[in-house]
């Protein structure tokens, strides 16, 4: 039998419409994890979701005249292995932009 050491892991999922803001947030999280002696893996890019909206230009007839609008949701995953209490405190105090949605799983 092999004895496997159970590692603690924090998985952080980030979502944003702006890719640059998302990458800056990922860099801050990884830098914080590295400063507290935790191992950070990532950011792992996930597929970008595109949502396309079709709007009629004319209020009455002319169905051939349409405009298309889209929103793109960029996503990333960061895994932090062997976090200490100092790592968790530093991540809680981290100031990230409001345009980035963050989901943390322990």
From Swiss-Prot:
The gene is rpsJ. Keywords: Ribonucleoprotein, Ribosomal protein. GO terms for cellular component: ribonucleoprotein complex; ribosome. Belongs to the universal ribosomal protein uS10 family. GO terms for molecular function: structural constituent of ribosome; tRNA binding. The keyword Ribonucleoprotein applies. The keyword Lipid biosynthesis does not apply. This is Small ribosomal subunit protein uS10. Involved in the binding of tRNA to the ribosomes. GO terms for biological process: translation. Disulfide bonds: none annotated.
């Amino acid at each position: 039998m092999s004895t496997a050491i159970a590692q603690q892991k924090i998985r952080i999922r980030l979502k944003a419409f702006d890719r640059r803001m998302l990458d800056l947030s990922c860099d801050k999280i990884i830098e914080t994890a590295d400063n507290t002696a935790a191992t950070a893996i990532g950011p792992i890019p996930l597929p970008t979701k595109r949502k396309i909206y079709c709007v009629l230009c004319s209020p009455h007839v002319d169905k051939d005249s349409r405009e298309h609008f889209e929103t793109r949701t960029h996503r990333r995953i960061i895994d932090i292995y062997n976090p200490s209490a100092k790592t968790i405190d530093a991540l809680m105090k981290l100031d990230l932009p409001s345009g980035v949605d963050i989901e943390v799983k322990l």
